[in-house]
A protein has these predicted regions:
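Short coil-to-beta strand junction motifs in C2/discoidin
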Residues: 261-268, 327-331, 444-453, 508-509
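Sequence context surrounding c-type heme c attachment/ligation sites in exported
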Residues: 35-102, 304-308, 725, 740-885, ...
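Aromatic, loop-rich ligand-recognition surfaces of beta-strand-rich domains
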Residues: 372, 388-468, 476-533
Length: 953
């Protein structure tokens, strides 16, 4: 039996495994059936309107655009989506041609819908990874995002809610693993760790080329703003803290703004693996941004998830003091305090929620204040002796945890005679397994140890034979381990330097850090177990049954309940602790098809309605309000509308906003392109962090405040902070906090098109491609139906600074007939956005890279020169525009098309399937003739009610 098979069989009874496999097989069969096209209504007479309005261009003789509508209508089924979209949005017939009346157009659309090829899609689908994680977290009272541990399975589908995404064996195995991790976090077998608290005021050593941008003061450490030579944000690492366990931690930075700096200073707080120099950086993740405005020291707090091995580092951003050496102004940090792992309440919500109504045995919360860190030698009560020392470079520096300070043998006024050595005292005869050595950093290397010999002694004067000897690396600054062949408990060890680097031939020696290697000390952490006062089988059964109703609806399948209870009972019978048995039973529920597959939408079934609404709007399970309402019976339209609007106001709807907007607009791929620092040297991690947040917050505001749909095209508001406002050239916004900002009517900003996130990700990081941007506007915002580009036509990437202008290059490309039709639609949108560079900043001239010699070294002025003036004019559907503002005015004339496309993509996200042509007719009918007054929430609600109540799919 394989390991995986053994895992399955030991965790689930055979019947449950069979049902899981049967479900996967059933979904697969449905998927196979989806490829069998169903012919629409045969024998439908083709409306005369097609002959009247279409056949001049699309009969068999003409077939303009390779569309022979005459033959297509004679031989159904057909893929009529392109023709349908042109017809329903008014793109066809062309504006200069006679137009069908409303009734005739409706007849034509209905006929195309009837003839459209259809696919049988599964009526249910598997949960997306975000839906699974949020659902389990909400059920258990957790806040622990493990979505990255689950495969997306999205592939090339637009949304991860697509019903064609199937459950697979790797996905199920990942679900099992993640479920275990979440249940263990909710009900840890060892108990909950005591909260520990640390304080650090020391920096870990950094390269000398960056240390000069910090200055120790009586109050703390003063930082100026610097960037590494490669352009990355250079972070200074704090010492004396490393999280012992994964969990949530509170990080408090006591700091102030010092000196003449006009705006707030931003402190970026990172976590990641420590690195010494920027030539070997390690991945860092941004935990949060703090804003310093006061000249008085104040506490600034953030919460973040940390893991063992993480090191806290900070990067201080203030544009006025870039690379000021030995700074007099900047961010002054007195100390950093950390506490954790945190629990949201005591007792934790996972227990108080799961065992609501049952008494718990809850110990008093333990808080441990951690002592200042010690070296291993200090911890065992040891000490050091040295053969000699130079004043200011004493032996204590080998035990201060900072490798840029060091011990050095005496070299003036006279050079100490060899041998040079260090004696390590072990008064309590602790078992030693080796030594830890670090060279000193930041200097010329003079005195660094090349070879060594180690001897042991019982009295500190008579030394035995060598117990270890060898070479040390003098090239790199890192900790090196010297392991003994056998552990030793001698009270004295002598580390003799037998050869050292010398620049002038004198006999000298130096060491940055030297410590002993000992067995791990007993864990200092205390664990606190919480469990119900009554751990009987009846309590176990009641808790599992109640959980099942919350997770699966009020009427979960009886056989699933029985399987869950049987597994929990078996665990208890085997002598497992109560919480272990509970986790086994809950895992059965959470890994069952009933939980992992979305319910079939049934407007007459209250629990199904509640589950579907919660999944769409919260990516989770229903709350008590929704459950209570749906228990009374099916929701009518007004009740459903009220619940949708209520749920949009709930903070949990931000999950939907992030998911929907990220996939629809492409923000999920925001990190794939980074602007070139040669062309756009002002682009930094702070800007990169906040750009997508502007778009997410803007879209959430439109939905919650029911602002009109035209805000997508142009708006007088956005969400900015100091860094974004500076990037956009907007005055009066101070501080790192994102807030709603009223835009000046003369501003170039407003709406999605001019947001830096959109402008950045629709380029290659160097050039602003009108083709890429135009295609994005055409597809994501306008919904223009476009066929794929011909395979034989090469991709065009325009370049500035050539003899041919940008537009001339594109026009030459589009002379090919195969390219002209699409580029006629997409290129004008891109031309209108040419006043924005690849970082999203306004410009009036193009930049071209200026050659430089040697390796790239970051500099604020970059490596570019100015080239041609920007031309942001164009022609859209026969109407000319001169800039982005006049192009927006033309787009607002096509607002009904924008609203219709938004309705389609929201329908797709909510239902898990693209709307059929019949459904598109219904969606289009929701858009009023004057859509400028159509609220975003109103439209979303209409579409969602249609999804929920249309049981014809």
């Amino acid at each position: 039996m394989s390991t995986q098979s053994a895992f399955f069989s030991s965790t689930y009874p055979r019947g449950l495994i069979t049902r899981l496999c049967g479900l996967a097989w059933m979904v697969w069969m449905l998927w196979e059936g989806a490829h069998k096209m169903l012919q629409g209504a045969e024998g439908n007479q083709v409306p005369e309107a097609f002959q009247t309005f279409c056949m001049d261009c699309h009969d068999s003789d003409t077939a303009k655009g390779n569309l022979d509508l005459e033959q297509a209508l004679k031989h159904p089924p057909l893929d009529a989506s392109l023709a349908f979209e042109q017809l329903i949005t008014g793109g066809m017939p062309p504006a200069e041609k006679p137009q069908p009346g409303p009734m005739e157009r409706h007849q034509m659309l209905t006929h195309l819908a009837n003839r459209q090829t259809q696919m049988n899609l599964p009526s249910s689908r598997r949960l997306s990874r975000q839906e699974f994680i949020h659902s389990v977290n909400d059920l258990l009272g957790l806040d622990w995002d493990l979505s990255e541990a689950l495969p997306t399975g999205k592939g090339t589908f637009l949304f991860d809610s697509d019903r064609r995404i199937l459950p697979t064996e790797p996905w199920m195995a990942a679900v099992f693993h993640v479920t275990d991790r979440l249940l263990n976090r909710a009900f840890p077998s060892k108990g909950f760790p005591a909260e520990q608290r640390w304080v650090t005021q020391r920096l870990r050593h950094s390269h000398d080329s960056y240390d000069i941008y910090t200055r120790p003061t009586e109050e703390g450490i003063l930082f100026s703003w610097t960037r590494a030579n490669n352009g990355n944000s250079y972070s200074f690492f704090y010492d004396d803290f490393e999280p012992p366990l994964s969990g949530w931690y509170e990080i408090q930075v006591e700091a102030k703004k010092q000196g003449a700096i006009e705006r707030d200073i931003s402190i970026e707080v990172y976590a990641g693996k420590y690195y010494f120099a920027d030539d070997r950086p390690q991945p860092q993740r941004l935990l949060g941004v703090l804003s310093l405005s006061s000249p008085e020291i104040q506490p600034h707090t953030l919460r973040a998830r940390l893991h063992p091995g993480d090191q806290i580092s900070i990067h201080c951003y203030a544009e006025e003091n870039f690379r000021e050496q030995d700074p007099e102004r900047g961010a002054l940090i007195r100390k950093i305090s950390i506490r954790g792992p945190l629990v949201n309440t005591w007792p934790p919500t996972s227990l108080s929620k799961t065992f609501a109504g049952f008494p718990l045995k809850v110990p008093e919360r333990i808080i441990q204040t951690m002592p200042p860190p010690q070296t291993h030698l200090q911890a065992i009560g040891g000490g050091l002796q040295v053969s000699s020392f130079q004043e200011g470079m004493e032996k204590e520096y080998m035990q201060d945890g900072i490798a840029r300070t060091f011990w050095h043998s005496r070299f003036k006024p006279e050079v100490a005679s060899p041998p040079h050595f260090v004696i390590l005292e072990n008064p309590h005869r602790q078992i030693l397994r080796g030594l830890l050595y670090s060279t000193w950093t930041g200097g010329n290397g003079n005195g660094q140890v090349k070879t060594y010999r180690i001897q042991a002694s019982e009295n500190g004067s008579e030394w035995g034979p060598s117990i270890a000897e060898g070479d040390l690396d003098v090239q790199l600054a890192h900790e090196q381990t010297i392991a003994f062949k056998e552990p030793i408990d001698s009270p004295f060890l002598r580390f003799e330097i037998t050869d050292a680097l010398s620049l002038d031939g004198r006999s000298i020696a130096s060491i940055g850090e030297l410590d002993v290697l000992v067995d791990e000390a007993p864990e200092e952490r205390q664990w606190q177990i919480i469990e119900p006062a009554d751990t009987s089988v009846s309590v176990l059964q009641e808790v599992i049954l109640r959980f099942a109703k919350r997770a699966l609806g009020n009427d979960p399948a009886q056989e699933l309940i029985e399987a869950s209870l049987a597994i929990a009972q078996r665990s208890m019978d085997q002598g497992d602790p109560f919480l272990t048995a509970l986790k086994a039973g809950l895992k059965t529920l959470l890994c069952s098809p009933s939980f992992l597959m979305t319910p079939v939408i049934d407007p007459q079934d209250g629990p199904s309605t509640a589950s579907t609404l919660a999944r769409i709007l919260w990516l989770s399970v229903p709350d008590d309000v929704l459950i209570e309402m749906t228990q009374r019976g099916p929701l009518n339209r007004e009740d459903m509308r009220g619940q949708i609007l209520r749920m949009l106001q709930d903070a949990r709807s931000q999950r939907m906003v992030r998911s929907f907007v990220g996939q629809w607009l492409g923000l999920d791929g925001f990190d794939q392109v980074t602007p070139s620092l040669k062309l756009y040297p002002a682009y930094d991690t702070l800007l990169h962090h906040f750009l997508p947040k502007e778009t997410e917050m803007f879209m959430a505001h439109l939905m919650r405040e029911n602002l009109t749909i035209d805000h997508l095209i142009d708006s007088d508001i956005s969400f900015l902070n100091q860094r974004l406002a500076r990037h956009y050239g907007i005055e009066g916004v101070v501080g790192a906090q994102m807030r709603r900002v009223r835009l000046d009517p003369a501003s170039h900003r407003g709406g999605l098109l001019t947001m830096g996130s959109i402008l950045k990700m629709t380029t290659d990081g160097f050039e602003s491609s009108p083709i890429r941007r135009g295609a994005w506007v055409s597809k994501q915002l306008m919904g223009n139906p476009l066929p794929p580009p011909p395979p034989s036509v090469p991709t065009l990437e325009p370049h500035h600074g050539l003899e041919a202008s940008l537009k001339e290059q594109i026009n030459q490309h589009t002379q090919q007939a195969a390219c002209r039709a699409c580029h006629k639609i997409i290129d004008p949108y891109g031309f209108g956005l040419e006043s924005f560079d690849a970082s999203g900043q306004w410009r009036e001239r193009y930049r071209v890279i200026q050659p430089h010699s040697g390796t790239f070294q970051y500099r604020p002025e970059g490596y570019y020169q100015w080239a041609d003036p920007v031309d942001a004019s164009g022609t859209l559907q026969g109407q000319s525009f001169r800039d982005i503002q006049s192009m927006k005015a033309l787009l607002r004339q096509d607002l009904k098309k924008v609203a219709y496309h938004f309705a389609k993509v929201w329908f797709h996200y909510a239902s898990g399937a693209e709307p059929t042509l019949h459904e598109r007719i219904a969606l289009h009918a929701m858009i009023p003739e004057d859509p400028s007054r159509l609220g975003m929430a109103d439209l979303m609600t209409k579409v969602l009610i249609h999804v929920m109540r249309d049981d014809t799919r």
